[in-house]
From Swiss-Prot:
Gene name tied to this protein: frr
Protein name: Ribosome-recycling factor
Biological process according to GO: translational termination
Organism the protein comes from: Mycoplasmoides gallisepticum (strain R(low / passage 15 / clone 2))
Biological role stated in the UniProt entry: Responsible for the release of ribosomes from messenger RNA at the termination of protein biosynthesis. May increase the efficiency of translation by recycling ribosomes from one round of translation to another.
Keyword entries, A-Z: Cytoplasm, Protein biosynthesis
One GO MF term: ribosomal large subunit binding
Compartments, record wording: Cytoplasm
Length: 183
């Protein structure tokens, strides 16, 4: 029996958790413009709820500004309405055929609240990694490895991999916290 089967299972699942975690952190405002905060915004477009990325080009001309240039001028007001409806605490300003969003400076209170949010998301990600650890250990047990030493070795390796992913989450979290707390 090879450990690679178990490590591949663990890595595949843990990497998807890391990707989810990074995506969630990108949505939390840090005072700098980030297009990820618009990922869930959808506007009515030809009768369908359409993601902004499919209706307009999105860019960051300045560190605290997002520029939205709709592909069709007629959709400017639809996009503005969708941004207001999305409840992101942003003020979209129509500037001719484009929309500008100036990101306000975050207050100390907002920053601390955002740190709490990212810590909660970090805990959720760690919990998911621990669930993967449990599932991997259950797979090892269900395969009924006769050699007790090999079984123990596999469990130790799973613990090492778990620690690696938990440390990776902690590192990403620390970087985001630093970003949130810096002015």
């Amino acid at each position: 029996m090879e450990f690679k089967t178990y490590s591949d299972f663990f890595d595949k699942n843990a990497n998807s958790i890391i990707n989810w975690f990074e995506g969630e952190l990108a949505k939390v405002r840090s005072g700098r413009a980030n297009l990820k905060i618009l990922d869930n915004v959808r506007a009515e477009y030809y009768g369908e709820q359409t993601p902004l990325i499919e209706m307009a080009s999105l860019s960051i001309p300045e560190p605290r500004e997002i520029l939205i240039k709709p592909y069709e001028k007629s959709s400017v007001n639809l996009i503005q309405a969708a941004l207001l409806k999305a409840n992101l605490n942003l003020t979209p300003v129509v500037d001719g055929d484009k929309i500008r969003i100036k990101l306000p400076l975050l207050t100390e209170e907002n920053r601390k609240e955002n740190v709490k949010k990212v810590k909660a998301v970090g805990e959720k990600a760690k919990q998911e990694v621990r669930f993967i650890r449990r599932d991997t250990l259950n797979k090892i047990k269900s395969d009924k490895i006769a050699d007790k030493d090999l079984n123990k070795y596999f469990e130790e390796q799973v613990d090492k991999i778990t620690k690696k992913y938990i440390d990776q989450i902690d590192s990403i979290l620390a970087k985001k916290e630093k970003d949130l707390l810096s002015l």
